[in-house]
Amino acid sequence: MLLYTAKRILLAILVSLTVSALVFSLLYLSGDPATALAGERASQADIMAIKAAYGFDQPVYIQYFKWLAGALQGEFGESVYFRMPVIDLIVDRLPVTMMLGVSAMIFALALSIPLGVLAAMYPNSLIDRAALLLAVVGQALPSFWFALMLIVLFAYWVPILPASGSDSWQHFVLPTIVLGYYATPAFMRLTRTGLLDVLSSDYVRTARAKGLSPAKVLFKHALRNAIIPVVSLAAVQFGFMLTGSIIIETVFALHGAGFLAWESISRSDFPTVQAVLLLFSWFYIILTFLADLLNAWLNPRIRVA
């Protein structure tokens, strides 16, 4: 286990460095960042002053290492648009994003696990096919389109929920449904597949032969083992949810870190964009690393592979 953990740590570090290099390179995708920050009417003297202030006059590799060293210390510089430290902006917006992610995860698990259990208990039935249809639609439906449909339905046609904002719990209902529904199919399919495998195992057949009730066999023996892969997947999916929150928060005008990223992109606020993308990426890498360790602990064969 120690050797496997060391390998995963090394891989996580390499992936983190690669991601940081890609995020930093976004600064130069649109050309000279100093010119973009100065504006179209800026003089050459203004551009040179911005280059000196932000260190754009130094070699790119030096800029990268300085930026990475600052990022490791939580220092991302000052926001070009908001005129305040980037880390303070993110800390202020992050609770909204975390609240959305946690509520969406709870919604996804609460919907997918019962559906997966029913689909496994009644294979090839109407319930099973309805669950399969839900999975197909959930994977194929664009999240922004689904969000717009819910806004039209529940904020305008039947105005019972707000269309935008983040001041009360009502503002999180529609975003939670959209973000959680996108993750539901993966959990549902994994629950169904895992439960079908467990129900056909020898120890479950033995439990049935002992005269245990179907409910006791399901909840005490089968579901407890079938749900383990779902828990591992939840860690990875939570990282996906935080990344997907950029679109959802923008559509619903939730003032979280995802919406901050969109605001910063539209205003060419490079330091803030880089910080949000890097922190989201690192958080996802950490969750994936923890999920790998959990899988290896639960399934020793993974450590040998």
Give short role names for the model-derived ranges:
Residues 15-65, 155-174:
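Hydrophobic alpha-helical transmembrane segments of membrane transport/permease proteins
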